[in-house]
Amino acid sequence: MDVKTYPVLEAAKNRTLLDNATYLEWYRESVADPEKFWGEHGKRIEWFEPYTKVKNTSFEGDVSIKWFEDGLTNVSYNCIDRHLKTHGEKTAIIWEGDNPYLDKKITYNELYDKVCRLANVLKEQGVKKGDRVTIYMPMIPEAAYAMLACARIGAIHSVVFGGFSPEALAGRIVDCESTFVITCDEGVRGGKPVALKENTDTAIDIAARQHVTVSKVLVVRRTGGKVGWAPGRDLWYHQETAAAEPHCPPEKMNAEDPLFILYTSGSTGKPKGVLHTTGGYLVYASMTHQYVFDYQDGDIYWCTADVGWVTGHSYIVYGPLANAATTLMFEGVPNFPDAGRFWEVVDKHKVNIFYTAPTAIRSLMGAGDDFVKRSSRSSLRLLGTVGEPINPEAWEWYYHVVGDERCPVVDTWWQTETGGILITPLPGATDLKPGSATRPFFGVQPQIVDSDGKVVDGAADGNLCITDSWPGQMRTVYGDHERFIQTYFSTYKGKYFTGDGCRRDEDGYYWITGRVDDVLNVSGHRLGTAEVESALVSHNLVSEAAVVGYPHPIKGQGIYCYVSLMAGEVGDDELRQALVKHVRSEIGPIATPDKIQFAPGLPKTRSGKIMRRILRKIAEDDFGSLGDTSTLADPGVVDDLIANRQNRA
């Protein structure tokens, strides 16, 4: 195919931190001598006791990943205290509310006060180093304070996206045996309240039935809405923090002490607790934030993600604050009050760097250029995209219409598991190709492997693996190291398998082609097909379900469900609606099925395995190339599925 290349813009070249020659030199060093390279760059954060060991990692056998392992530091100290002398009065967080008339600015001095008070409240309530604290919050500054307060005292935070259901929240509380929850009376999204405290109460009841008791709930008052209250367990955030001491010494943490657990979808139904540790994670998050976005002092930086996802952890909170940046937190949604909201916020706060997801770009593109054109966007210098591959059409629109052809687009590829960006352009160094994540970041060694496990060189297609560790890499699955090894290191021995398909072109640029396992990427968020299947099957009229992804114009991938009902039951639109509602309540709105096809039978092999390949093809309305169906126990089901498909072109 004919691929357009956009050379590095002169303006980007003139102010960049890294030009192409420097990128190539640093990259060569980082791969040839990672000890030396990261030994130098590890010093970008402050250490209470410096490290003497840099890298101690193995992708073989019991898989062990350690970086800077004898160093002592603290993430909260690095994100706040060390900036106070020179940047105390600088704005750390700009908060933009769901309501366009609501905003506030928090300086680094104020951030210190808020975080120390909250850290002292946690300590007074018995939270100790190593305890797990669940944070179930909307996009308000208190969510960032909560993360930083946990880091300050050595507690491990587990942030759960505010859009998840009580059942999903309970599962995450139980898995890490969390006894302390920080939440909010209600969230606000798109003008509507979100019942976070009510969901928390329900989740705590579910967790109690599984023998995990939450002893304290700290509640932020956001809307003043009426909420249930358990005296002795529930505490008001504003009352407790007002009475707390405004200073709290940071705990000295080993570089390999856990910082947070973040649950992500796997191909089996049970979400995995991805565990990130302290030193390597912060070095990598801050370094990628600085160089990928060409961040320089004074820039206003806005990542539109939610703190409930890894992008919010690394590129709203930890990366930017470690770099003394001004980071914008947005409570709202891109289309409220209308589809011009993002660009109004850019103008209002003079945003220089803007980082969002392809799904938002596609939906705003669909709303038309007028919403963009009524804003000036003259402050913008750099655009970024994250969460899923961006199709070239959306890339071009973003570059030409939003960026007025003067802002490089950094299309970043990474995962919850990687802690930070792995493959990305650098704005002053990399010629851009719409749809390509381009080249690896420092220390990252990608490899393309075919399905037989053979490494393929040059221009090639296959499965994306990484051959050596980098500091931001996850260390284990919380409480289940065996699952960590099985999921990531057993498919291709001695390599980290990303679960993504990938193409490398003749210039060595990488193009991510999407998941190759049973994981969907819906609006840039990962969702295991097994999770959606379990939710469907838990409905009393459903006997079996199979879920696959299909191309969706806005969300990237839509959710297509094949559902077999109990004997004697008949599928109709009313039942479809009921099943949609059921899945939403089991998992959350993010898992809303787009298509439900009632299927008397599913294509199975004689051993009973569902042939998802066939279901994917039918969902994609592409059944001319189904391949050999003779191995199916009942090949006749395929004709029925094709005849009743819900996705006709």
UniProtKB/Swiss-Prot annotation:
It holds the Pfam family ACAS_N. One of its GO terms (cellular component) is cytosol. Mg(2+) binds at V537, H539, V542. Its EC number is 6.2.1.1. One of its GO terms (biological process) is acetyl-CoA biosynthetic process from acetate. Catalyzes the conversion of acetate into acetyl-CoA (AcCoA), an essential intermediate at the junction of anabolic and catabolic pathways. AcsA undergoes a two-step reaction. In the first half reaction, AcsA combines acetate with ATP to form acetyl-adenylate (AcAMP) intermediate. In the second half reaction, it can then transfer the acetyl group from AcAMP to the sulfhydryl group of CoA, forming the product AcCoA. This is Acetyl-coenzyme A synthetase. It comes from Rhizobium meliloti (strain 1021). The gene is acsA1.
